[in-house]
């Protein structure tokens, strides 16, 4: 539906400098991570003068590791060269010294923790995105029974990393999440968001068709 056809993220870097990002980031969305850990994700350099990096757009669980061209950096509250500090409340990291020439700064990210909860299952992440990013009312707009049931079927943790939240459509993210448990998503007739899983057939078959019976397959319409 239309509400899920737009970008995952509505905001973008202004490109005016400082925490709003340099000119090279103008119009780009912030990085987004859910669940995880999401390994080896390239962080955005927001403020080169102050060595400020972004790995999300809100409160996050943790930046579990940070590397400069593969070499690990050490976390410290007052970083010096070879170290960094981590602000999980805003998903920002600050380097203690200038990175190496042609540096690529990558991290292992434990994702979004809005409201104090780190959601890690595909159903919980999908629901959180629908509510916080697309304005779906919870529980009024959610098929809560379906989401609860899928958390029992697919309780394993997943990781979702998006380098630019403006370049990915919400519906595509939902498709990727439900694919992790052979599932589907959509809206019911009462407009509630629902999910399900395509499981193997159950019960006694009324007929069987194999290579002997099937001569050809021809669409009827």
Name these PLM-found stretches:
Residues 1-221:
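Interface-prone segments of viral and bacterial extracellular assemblies
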């Amino acid at each position: 539906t239309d509400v899920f056809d737009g970008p995952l993220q509505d905001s973008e870097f202004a490109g005016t400098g400082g925490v709003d990002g340099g000119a090279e980031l103008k119009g780009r969305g912030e990085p987004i991570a859910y669940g995880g850990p999401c390994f080896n994700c390239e962080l955005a350099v927001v403020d080169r003068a102050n060595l400020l990096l972004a790995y999300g757009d809100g409160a996050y669980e943790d930046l579990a590791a940070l590397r400069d061209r593969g070499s690990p950096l050490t976390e410290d509250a007052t970083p010096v060269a070879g170290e960094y500090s981590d602000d999980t409340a805003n998903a920002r990291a600050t380097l203690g010294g200038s990175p190496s020439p042609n540096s690529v700064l990558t991290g292992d990210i434990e994702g979004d923790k809005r409201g104090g909860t780190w959601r890690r299952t595909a159903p919980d992440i999908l629901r959180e995105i629908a509510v916080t990013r697309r304005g779906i009312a919870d529980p009024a707009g959610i098929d809560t029974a379906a989401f609860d049931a899928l958390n029992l079927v697919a309780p394993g943790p997943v990781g979702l990393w998006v380098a630019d939240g403006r370049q990915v459509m919400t519906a595509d993210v939902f498709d990727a999440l439900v694919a992790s448990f052979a599932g589907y998503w959509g809206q019911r007739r009462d407009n509630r968001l629902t999910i399900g899983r395509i499981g193997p057939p159950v019960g006694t078959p009324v007929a069987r068709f194999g290579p002997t019976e099937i001569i050809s397959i021809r669409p009827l319409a």
